[in-house]
Amino acid sequence: MSKSLAGLAVLAALFIAVDAFRPSGLTNGHATFYGGSDASGTMGGACGYGDLYSAGYGTMTAALSTALFNDGASCGECYRITCDHAADSRWCLKGASVVITATNFCPPNFALPNNNGGWCNPPLKHFDMAQPAWEKIGIYRGGIVPVVFQRVSCYKKGGVRFRINGRDYFELVNIQNVGGAGSIKSVSIKGSKTGWLAMSRNWGANWQSNAYLDGQALSFSITTTDGATRVFLNVVPSSWSFGQIYSSNVQF
């Protein structure tokens, strides 16, 4: 095989094609906001992304209610949220919509009724949005507005990122800045001295391996929830250390 054909074969192995992510239908819900005018209170969160600025999410984010969060499997998904002006002309900005990324969980509050403070109680479909995102669709004093939403494709700048946490025999990898479907179905990891090893979701967007991979270059194979797969060969160098973030040039 010629070098050019071999190169094409490697490239094809990195991208397993599926149909482009297709937006969902429209669904009704409600939205509130949190985190302050600069969204500083939204950092961290139940997906484990940490600093949402450095992770690529900025202020266009939201915490999802139980009905949407799916025990963390929805981390990274993108939603277009439109304020339902027909249902609330007082507090909705007419025709306004915004695309957010799911980065956190809005826990239920069973001490309060669903229609008066228990906004994130099951089975409600609710977005607790970063304040800057919410103010693109609603008037601040309204506090809560009815919305129409749909899941849409995520468009991210740069490649997928990997933050390596944990300790020896326990690699906890937070996978960030995922485009396309945004949410992840499965992950495998490969050290330069191992074969491919399946990882398991620990919590949020954190995936774990119990292999000893110190001193090895790390590769990942990620399949998103729409079935698209990308392979990130040697994206983490053998000199890696816990607590560091490593960026790829590959995106969905």
From Swiss-Prot:
Domain Expansin-like CBD: 169-248
Annotated tissue distribution: Expressed in the leaf, but not in the epidermis or in the vascular bundles.
SUPFAM superfamilies cross-referenced by the UniProt entry: Barwin-like endoglucanases, PHL pollen allergen
Entry-linked InterPro entries: Expan_Lol_pI (IPR007118), Expansin (IPR002963), Expansin/allergen_DPBB_dom (IPR007112), Expansin_CBD (IPR007117), Expansin_CBD_sf (IPR036749), RlpA-like_DPBB (IPR009009), RlpA-like_sf (IPR036908)
Annotated membrane topology: Peripheral membrane protein
Gene Ontology cellular component list: extracellular region; membrane
Keywords noted in UniProt: Cell wall, Cell wall biogenesis/degradation, Membrane, Secreted, Signal
Ranges for domain Expansin-like EG45: 44-159
Subcellular location, principal: secreted
Localization per record: Secreted, Cell wall; Membrane
GO annotation terms (biological process): anatomical structure morphogenesis; plant-type cell wall loosening
Pfam families assigned: DPBB_1 (PF03330), Expansin_C (PF01357)
Name of the protein: Expansin-A11
